[in-house]
Each structure stands twice: as structure tokens, then as C-alpha cells.
């Protein structure tokens, strides 16, 4: 069969179409956006088979999916001149279809990764890719991003939004989704006065800008041409052996291969309305590409992270990021290393990129045998996960306890739990690559790795349980190695620990000697951990080896519990060498209180003084906090905390009157406690209220009281530990108490 050859890198994969090829088999045409060796972009096409049963298994909560059902969904999403909301109500099915198709594509063409050069081979009579192999001179490139900003002001009937919100399942009160449901059901006036759809796409060489009052009418303002940013191309592909080739159309980006949207200036619906306009103009006849997006707005309970994943048209990946350069760099890094799957596909990202098909019974059985053999090889005692079913959390310190000296090192394993999984499944080279990148200090990979392991119990429970067993066995081996060096592990929390050497008083050990001892200890503990995995018959993929990091050498420590402690290196001075874990700081007031307590702790340990002096300093610090709170008593952002949408019941009626502000209600919901009429303060979500926000009086005291109580409790514990350390068997002469009621008149 005649073939053509070219070289380029895959920059994006989008769904083009899907149709039934049997009761349980769907054919999916994929469009691969490729940057060719000449620097220009082109579209390549691949045809794969997807099992409908597999889609059903992945789409948890979706009803049984058939191939005919997938064809119906694809046809609806490709219909020109329709609102681009075909994915609403079917997001789980679309996610499962995309992941299944992407995995099938990798199996058909050979494994590929975004922005990695490949030798592309396609048959000339079908126009379809048949392989994407790594050439001998392969080299990585970097994504070329355009910047997208969009905004939407659209009239949607408030009563329809309220009805959609009321119809949502328990824990599914996302107001952004309620607005989308009202739009889908015909309750949006697309030509109402005051409507605005704004769209701006900027590349290194061009700017495309439009403002519409009515998306169906010519724009009010314009700059640039569509041809400046996208080229219209036609291709011939043969999707069935005996059928004639069909013409498929695509937009190919000019001088960019991905889009970065500023999260603070981005409306996915505004962008989709503009894309729908282009879609209708391009696909006047012939097969049309699916048009749809995935985002937290489609989830009844919202999601923690913001994203906008373009399933199909216009075929270019979109990354939602903060405006600062560091965040964009980290998000693009995660985008490239996960082939665009993060964060949209959550717990499934690295499974989709890996070799194991969890829908294949034989493959799962093989992995389960490997897991069972590894667990059987672990030493008895403390390695079965029964004592610590989520990983070891322990402390030998009394509560509270205080220590000082130059030898309090802290260590932790980089990407610990994903690394242990990578030992069980060393074939998953993409996971190993992400672990290596995280170990090299690339922070953009951390959220995806945390989510991967957090969801592993739902994807493959035996693997999760095995990882926990390995983690606990490693913890036991690390402690034995530490004890052999006369080091006491004071606190061990899942992937890290801190403690002290017992062969000399810490305060008399020179810092250089303490540092050398800590580094030698790190090496011993690293070797002990590696020995556990080798004994279990496990070996990692290259780049996914265990890595125990030395996190610092501290001079002072105060511990209240395993998950609540303060470490400080006085040689660094101030807050620079400080690690403070466990203080409640959900609001800006809480964060201020945490800084105040840290300052009091530094004062107490660095310059020994009478407890009464520390208590007086604490009273002054709390007075300063109260005065700052008074000055910002009406500042909603100062008092604001967040809670998941799923934790809310019915929201106040006023929260549904924010119009376009509701579009942002798809993640953790910001709220403040406000004063009720002769009742306890209650939480009020303020993010969807029209600006300027007019609230009932903020219940400042309700926000402050628990924070100040915890400050006093933790400080008194530290003072008690200090007194005991100095050899005083009696409690401190004076405990710190702060009477917030003395200031009630300020907040009345």
C-alpha cells in the first residue's frame, strides 16, 4: 500500500466524528494537530475502534452506552448553528470516549507524546496515519502559545436558572451549570439589549478581535482577519475500505499550536459561541467536526480546578492559566507532559497514557498477580497497611513538646506514592517521566501526581492497597536505618519525617557536624527504602527511582501533634527558615493570626524570657489583630473562606440574581459568615452577588473567635513545653487568655 512520509510533532488530538460500526463498536475519526519540520502546522487523521462497553465502564454514573448512542452524541455535537452545549449532561460519556479513542490511537500508531518529533506515515489512498515512530534524530520542542481573552454578558431568565438549580441532584448546586441548563433549554435571549460577546486571540504575529452585541449579527468592533490566525484546509480521507474518499475540513493555526486563556479574563461560553460561528461558516455541507467543551461548569458539583478542554473543533488545545508567567510556564509544562489530559481527565490521566488497559480482564489479572507477589515478599509486621490504611502517621512526642539545638533535620520522599506505583508498573514510562520532572523541581506536575494517587483506589483498589503496604514497609525500614545511626524519628507523616540524633545534646553539636550527619542519614535511609522494594522484586522505570530529599536542618521545634508542628532554623533569621503546619488559616484573618503566632514562638525560643512577658506580647499581638479586623470589618475578601459546592444546601435567593457572575460558580464557593436576625451567624456565598457587594453585617466575631482560641491554645501548649524543657515541673506561671468580648463594641 503506497505511503507518504513526513516529520513533525503532535501538538493536539481532537475528536472529528464517531459512528456505529456494530452494536458495541464505534469508529472514531481523530484529527491530530501536527507542527511539521518547516514550522508550519497541519492536520493529520487517524481512525480507531472504540468499545462501547469500555466507554460505559469509564463513564461512572452514565447509563449503558451503545455505539449507536455515541453516534447520536457525535451527530448532535457536530450540528451547525446550534448552541455549543452538546456536552452538557453527557460530560462523563464524552470524557470516556475521548480517553478510549486516545489510548486506541497510541496503540495503533505507536506511543507518541506531545511536542516530540515523530516520523509520520500515512497511506495515500486513505489519507490516514498508520504510524508515528520516533526518528533517530528526535528532539523535543516547546509549545507555541497564542493568548485568548473572552467575556460574556448574556440575558438568561432568572426564574429558569432558579428552576435548573432546584432540579440539580443533592450536592449539585453549581450555579454556572444551572445557567448553562437554562441556556440549553431556550431561556437565553441572544439578541437582548446589553448582551456582549467579546473575543480576542493574540499570536506573535497577529491579533484577532471581535465584539458582538448579537452573535448572529456582524460584530460591533473588529480587528484582524480570521485568516491571520487560522488557515482553512481540506483533506480527503477514506474511512471504509470500499467507500469513496470524503472531504473533511479543518482550521489549522497559524504561528501557534496551543492557546493559553487568562483565567481571570476568560469565558468559555463566549469562546464557544465564537467557535460555533466559525463552525457554521466552515461546515455548510459535508461531514462536520464535533464542537464541544469539557469544564467544571458541566459538573453539578463543580470541580476544584478550572479548565476548558476542547473536544473537537477548532482542533487546537486550550490551557486555562493564571496571568503570571510562572503559572503559565507550569501549566504548559503539565499540559505537554500529560498530552493535554490534565486537569480535565483527573484521576485517569496517567492511566490513559500508560500501557495497562484496566478494561482488559487478562491485563488486570496479570497486574494483580504482580501485586500479590510483591506484597507477599514484604517483611512481616507493619507492612500490611492495617495500622495506617492511608500511610504511616505517627509521633513519639508528648503533646505538646518543644526541642532546640542544631540537629533537627527533616526529610521527605519526592512524589512518594506515585513513585511506589511506578515500581509496581514500570512499563508506565509517561508516569515515570512526570515523576522525574517533579523531582527536578517542576511544580506544575505536583497536582496531577497527587490526584493520580488520590484516585487510584477508585481505579484499581488492589494497586492502591499495595502502594500503602509498600509505603508502610518503607517507613519501618527507614526508622530502623535511622535508629542504627542513633537518630530518633520524632514525627513521621506518610512521605516524610523529622527528628533528632541522640548521641549528643543538640545544642552543643556544631552545625557543620549536624549537617554532615543529616546528609549521611539521608543516604542510609534512601538505601534502606530501596532495599525494601528490591526485596519485593520491584524495579522502577528510568527516572522513577525513590528520592529522599533533605528538607532542612532546624534549630527549634514545637510539636502539638503529628499533623501540627512548628520547625524553625534560627540561623536563617525571621520567618525565612520556618515551617509551620496545622494552624487554621482559611481566611486572611487566619493567615495573619498564623504569622503572629509564629512570631511569638520565635520570640519565646530565641530569647528566653518569663512566661508572663510572652503572655503580654501575645495580648499585644491579638490586640493588633483585632484592630486590623476592625479596619477591615466590611472587607468581604478579608473574611472570605471557601467550601465545596457539594457541601452546600440551598443557597439564598439573592445568590441567584448575579446574572453573568453565576458563570464563575463552578469551584470552591467563597462565603462569609453574616449576622442573622436574632439567630446564629450563617454562611452567605458572595461570589455571585452583583458588585458592589451589599451584604448584611459580616459576623467578624464568629470568624475571629475560633482562630484566636486556637492561637491561645497552641501558645499555651508551647509555653508549657518550654517550661518543662527548662526543668520546671510546674506549669507556666500565667496562661494566656484573650477575652474577645472586650471588643464586642467595635463590631456591634
Swiss-Prot record:
Keywords: DNA replication, Host nucleus. The keyword Plastid does not apply. Associates with the primase and the helicase to form the helicase-primase complex. Interacts with the origin-binding protein. Interacts with the polymerase catalytic subunit. Component of the helicase/primase complex. Unwinds the DNA at the replication forks and generates single-stranded DNA for both leading and lagging strand synthesis. The primase synthesizes short RNA primers on the lagging strand that the polymerase presumably elongates using dNTPs. The primase-associated factor has no known catalytic activity in the complex and may serve to facilitate the formation of the replisome by directly interacting with the origin-binding protein and the polymerase. GO terms for biological process: DNA replication; viral genome replication. GO terms for cellular component: host cell nucleus. It comes from the Viruses. Disulfide bonds: none annotated. It is found in: Host nucleus. This is DNA helicase/primase complex-associated protein. Its main location: host cell. The keyword Nucleotide-binding does not apply. Belongs to the herpesviridae HEPA family. InterPro entries: HSV_HEPA (IPR004996).
